Amino acid sequence: MTLLHDLEQTILSRKGTDPDTSWTAKLLSKGPEKCAEKFGEEAIEAIIEAVKDDKAKLASEGADVLYHFLVMLAARDVALDDVLTVLAERQGLSGLAEKAARPKG
């Protein structure tokens, strides 16, 4: 996970900096809603490439999804480690058992 943590740190270092100096700073300056919108766009592009069965393009879009996911997390002050903690808690649970254990509503 070092690469993702390094990317997270780079993204966090762009928070509050001049939006004209980097794409990340520009995206973060537009707020969490814009960051979420961009994440959604990238996820759709990844889905399209998965359906087309183009592995190279899917890998490229997957990288975009991971980057924009980290930007979206940063925009809401959620750490990657918070997400990893949830994944670790779910590890070993069947997907059906985990879903059934979620609070209703």
Curated annotation (Swiss-Prot):
For whether the record's keyword set contains Protein biosynthesis, the answer is: no
The organism's place on the tree of life at top rank: Bacteria
The protein's matches in InterPro entries, at most eight in alphabetical order, are given as: HisE (IPR008179), PRib-ATP_PPHydrolase-like (IPR021130)
In short, the EC number is: 3.6.1.31
What chemistry does it catalyse, as a reaction equation?
1-(5-phospho-beta-D-ribosyl)-ATP + H2O = 1-(5-phospho-beta-D-ribosyl)-5'-AMP + diphosphate + H(+)
Look up keyword Methyltransferase and say if it applies. no
Q: What is the main EC category here? A: hydrolase
Q: What is its main location?
A: cytoplasm
Look up the record and name the pathway of this protein.
Amino-acid biosynthesis; L-histidine biosynthesis; L-histidine from 5-phospho-alpha-D-ribose 1-diphosphate: step 2/9
Q: Which UniProt keywords apply?
A: Amino-acid biosynthesis, ATP-binding, Cytoplasm, Histidine biosynthesis, Hydrolase, Nucleotide-binding
What biological-process GO terms show up in the record?
L-histidine biosynthetic process
Q: Which Gene3D superfamilies match?
A: MazG-like
User: Where is this gene product found?
Assistant: Cytoplasm
Quote any Pfam family the record assigns.
Answer: PRA-PH
- State one molecular function term (GO): ATP binding
GO CC, sorted alphabetically, is: cytoplasm
Q: Which family does it belong to?
A: Belongs to the PRA-PH family.
PANTHER family tied to this protein:
HISTIDINE BIOSYNTHESIS BIFUNCTIONAL PROTEIN, HISTIDINE BIOSYNTHESIS BIFUNCTIONAL PROTEIN HIS7
NCBIfam families documented for this protein: histidine_hisI, PRK00400.1-3, PRK00400.1-5
What name goes with this protein? Phosphoribosyl-ATP pyrophosphatase
Which organism is this protein's natural source? Ruegeria sp. (strain TM1040) (Silicibacter sp.)
